[in-house]
Amino acid sequence: TLIFAQEKEGVSTSASMGSVTMDGKIYNQVAIRPEIPIGKLGLGLDVYVYFNDEGIYPGNWDFSDGNAFATLVDKIYYLRWGKPGDNLYFKVGALPSATLGQGILVNNYSNIMEYPQVRRVGLDFKMKFMKQFGVELIHSNFKKTAPGVLATRFSYDPFTRLSLGLSYVTDIDQNQGL
C-alpha cells in the first residue's frame, strides 16, 4: 500500500492505493481519508473504492439492503476529541499509532496492520486531572468480546519533569496473527 499524507491545521487528508483480495478476487483500492475538525472534535472518514477489470465492487456502497447503517458506519475511520497532550484526549476507531506513557511498554501500537481486510474499532484514551494525575487506556478492538491488546496506566506527576506511573499491559489474543 502506498500512502500520501498532508498535516496542516484544519482539514487534513491522506490517501492510499493498493490491492485487496475479497471473495477470492483481487481488487485495486483507492482510498481518501480526510479528517474534518470541528473545534476539538475530529472526524476521520474512509472513502474508498475497490475495482478490477470487471468494474467497481458494489458491496461497499450498497445502501439498499438491511445493512445500510453498518455500511455507513464503516466509512468512519475514527472519531477523536482533542490532541495528545491535552487534558482530555480520546480516539475511537483506527489507531495508527498509540503510545502508553513514555512508550516503554506500548510504543506506536497500531490496530490497522490488517486493514482494510480486518476493520477494528479501538480506543486510545488519555486524561489529566488536577494537573498531577493521569489515566490512560488503550483497547485494540471493541468488535470482539475478548480484546486483543489492553493497556492501562495511572500516573502521578509530583514535579514538572518527573512522572511516576503504574501500568498494566496484556495481549489476551496473542496467538491470533500466528
Language model features with spans:
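Short, solvent-exposed loop/edge-beta patches enriched in aromatic
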Residues: 34-43, 83-87
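Membrane-embedded beta-strand positions in outer-membrane beta-barrel channels/transporters
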Residues: 29-33, 75-78, 122-124, 151-153
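Hydrophobic h-region of N-terminal signal peptides that target proteins for export
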Residues: 1-5
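Short glycine/proline- and aromatic-enriched beta-strand/turn motifs that initiate or cap beta-hairpins
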Residues: 6-35
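Transmembrane beta-barrel strands of outer-membrane/channel proteins
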Residues: 15-19, 45-49, 94-96, 137-139, ...
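Signature for the C-terminal beta-barrel architecture of outer-membrane proteins
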Residues: 7-12, 25, 42, 55-57, ...
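Surface-exposed loop and membrane-interface regions of Gram-negative outer-membrane beta-barrel proteins
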Residues: 41-78, 105
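Gram-negative (and chloroplast) outer-membrane scaffold detector with strong preference
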Residues: 73-89
